[in-house]
Amino acid sequence: MASLSHAFGRGGFVAVKIARRDEPTSEQLASSVILTGTSALRMMRAERRQMGYISWRDLDPDEERRVLHASSPSAEDIYLPDLVRIGAVSGEAQEDLCLLVGSAAQRRRMPGVGWSVCSGLPVGSILEVEPGVYSLSPEALCVAVAREVGCIQAFALAQELCSKISLSDRGKYLPPYTSPVTNKLAKDKDQPADVGYFEVEPVLTPDRLADYLAVCKGNAAKQLQRLCPYLSENLRSPMECIMLALFSLPFSYGGFACGPFKTDYKIEFDDRAQAISGMPHAVCDAYQEAARFDLEYNGELGHSSRRGRIHDEKRNMGLITMGIEVATVNNEMLCDMEAVEALAWRMHQRMRKRYRNRVDARRKKQEALLNTLRACFGLKPV
């Protein structure tokens, strides 16, 4: 049966033709594995690191149902070197393999294996990694994280998958970290050596995730669906992801309700702006259209050199000439909730709105959101 496997390349949505192949037998399906949880997350990050995108094969609805309801692997069916090769497990650390089956009766008693049971999944939930090995799709993995870990952690994972970054698949612990003990592994710097990230292509869009969540059941999926409008696309660093989440998410989650932002947004300069900047246009990290406000994250890379500073100064003068206010945020400022709130107040003022955050214990909520996001992207709490 011929099918199409979808991947995101530099040109956008790409369809890759898959050769015609025979249907797997019932015995082959029974011995197959469906990876979920940490195992699927590790493998997805390994695939993005190696390929730059996800090359796995889509299944048609009938195939998905047959795989889910037939998979019941035994210990003899699980060959660890193959799972290490495709990135599902780390060869360096002892960890449970996370597998998905369609019913409790399909589980086998095996040491080192954690089972998740789900009798039905929406179309587009399972991808074929290679014959006999399947994984949750990016959308389905976000829902699994929302149900098993938390909604903000799932939002952070979705933001990673919508961005041009992938966190490391190596090491004993993977973000999102869930305890202070494992947080100690990360460094204070923006790009800790223990975690790091890779430049890749996005494998998800906010609209695609929202469409998937619309047919999912359960409170966790519905809560995550409400957060989809606050996701951004094509971000290029973990700190940009944290910055946009803080400024975009509603007050009730600990955010500052300044969204939506347009990322990588091109502003064409008029004659005066071109004359003062020497540039035909500027590309904004995060542009708030209603406020005519450009929010820039200033990391160390590319901004600390003399040439980089001069470029930024000219660019900012061009934007100011166009009536666009520019604010530059760094890691230190993002850790100061009073400073972030002052900037959010200014954005609301530019939108002709009053900044009214009436959430009880709002500072604690804001700090909790910041530390949860930092943990999700492999950074220590502040």
What is the meaning of each model-derived region?
Residues 192-382:
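Surface segments flanking catalytic/ligand-binding clefts of nucleic-acid enzymes
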Residues 1-220, 359, 369-382:
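Short gly/ser-rich loop at a beta-strand->alpha-helix junction or flexible surface loop bordering the NTP-binding
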